[in-house]
Curated annotation (Swiss-Prot):
Keywords: DNA replication, Phosphoprotein. Plays an essential role in viral DNA replication by acting as the polymerase processivity factor together with protein OPG116. Serves as a bridge which links the DNA polymerase OPG071 and the uracil DNA glycosylase. Interacts with the DNA polymerase catalytic subunit OPG071. Interacts with UDG/OPG116. Component of the uracil-DNA glycosylase(UDG)-OPG148-polymerase complex; OPG148 and UDG form a heterodimeric processivity factor that associates with OPG071 to form the processive polymerase holoenzyme. Interacts with OPG117. The keyword ATP-binding does not apply. This is DNA polymerase processivity factor component OPG148. GO terms for biological process: DNA replication. It holds the Pfam family Chordopox_A20R.
Amino acid sequence: MTSSADLTNLKELLSLYKSLRFSDSAAIEKYNSLVEWGTSTYWKIGVQKVANVETSISDYYDEVKNKPFNIDPGYYIFLPVYFGSVFIYSKGKNMVELGSGNSFQIPDDMRSVCNKVLDGDNGIDFLRFVLLNNRWIMEDAISKYQSPVNIFKLASEYGLNIPNYLEIEIEEDTLFDDELYSIIERSFDDNFPKISISYIKLGELRRQVVDFFKFSFMYIESIKVDRIGDNIFIPSVITKSGKKILVKDVDHLIRSKVREHTFVKVKKKNTFSILYDYDGNGTETRGEVIKRIIDTIGRDYYVNGKYFSKVGSAGLKQLTNKLNINECTTVDELVDEINKSGTVKRKIKTQSAFDLSRECLGYPEADFITLVNNMRFKIENCKVVNFNIENTNCLNNPSIETIYGNFNQFVSIFNIVTDVKKRLFE
């Protein structure tokens, strides 16, 4: 007889199986462990373990229409498709980036709200979100039982950002051309840049997507950063005429291999241009591009997830958190605070600045040492004043790439620790 615990496991296995295409590595690992349990318990359960699943939503969206076409009579819901990084929140109860399958940590309150929306309709396959400038907006909701409008209303009541949408009855065959596209796009009337329009005919599940645009090439004068939050900066690509080309995040910049004083391919919309999301031309490896872009942005910044952050006092905050002492705003305050604790003072004395700084940032030791062994440092008065990576091949390791993107912060913390050691023990 099947126990209640077994039924719980089987229900979870079924739920994970249905949302595999939207799963991250943790969910896949959980799924595989349940498959292994089910196979050993029941011998045959009808599903198999998987190695990796690329996040895809192609079953729910038709091919993009980029030329005028006739739209049939009927009742339609039109939705904006926003510029930004696309994420899927599904029954696996995790936020997964479309295409890469990478999971993304969201605030607990947002996760709770997403779960409430999912729990309110068993027919929801997934919620589609867009992240731009560190802001989330729910872009679509796929349900077998109801239109996205009803789900948007519920999500809005819970405090999520939802799109403006348009409900229209089309009474006769109508040409969907640039003029109609522009009318619908303007009706959405919000501040998020829109790259296309999707629509659903009443009674149908699949979305149709319309994207009228032109390709162009623009000359890049500079690569800068724009502040979008508390110590959060997004890459900004500026043309020779001073216009700004929209960039999703740091990875978008890297993939496109943008370089100052060269031309880049863009998608031109009515009111803005988008950095074309493709693996840019040229022979540069990803590692070489990362090095060049970080050098261009400058040593005052480090890669912080999808964006940049300024080194500033962030190192002091992380160091005080690691040492479990009161927050300090200057090195003088830090020295005074350390002197209050014999345990902390002994830790500073016995542990190298190198190891303490690495631990403070949580870098894996083996990957960190591999990176450092491929770098050359300029040291003055025991502090790092400059560094250069001599072999970018090691950046093919995603973990090492992350550490390198964050390395300016490591240098800041290392120099603080070095300064503190001098003041305490010399």
